[in-house]
Amino acid sequence: MAKNVFQVHGVDRKEKALWRRRLTRENWLKVLHETVEPGCEIGMESCGGAHHWARRLQEKGFTVKLIAPQFVKPYVKSNKNDANDAEAICEAMSRPGMRFVAVKTVAQQDIQAVHRVRSELNKQRTAKANQIRGLVSEYGLVAPKEIVHLRRALPRWLEDVENGLSERFRRLLDGLWSDLKVLDERMEELDREIALIAQSDPVAKRLQQLRGV
């Protein structure tokens, strides 16, 4: 699936190709709804946007199977392009023992998005802390390894007029401290969001009841 063009490859029960079409983002659902009987199986790679379109197709009565790209690749017969990929998906989904990806609900995608954003923010915060450590070391200041101690050291460095820091660097360091605090606040917001999700999710509730969790 491209962003604006959808390559469709249709086969019958004997895997004989019936039609190949390039459809636009605006009309592909309408064309499928008018052309393909409800209940027919539709396969897609589980790439970006696949879960959204899978839900839309399910709403129209189709059975949707998502396949991880690595399981489709062995069935691409020639040069990789949209048409060959669509044909490979058809072949892959008919293979016995093929493993499929469960279609995520909107709520499940929300949870995934929250965790992805939190993970990225955590990387940014670690990078910011390391940047601060590297800069202050050039001025003879030893930065604590743990971030909780770094937070405590920053205001002390800024207030200490005897540590040899120039006014220019103090302003720079104050800005970096502000950056770090913003990242801390965003992380705290997402931690609260994750806690709310855990309270409302039945699976998370059961996991929390396990010893050691």
Identify the residue ranges that each predicted region occupies.
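A detector of single, family-specific signature residues
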Residues: 1-213
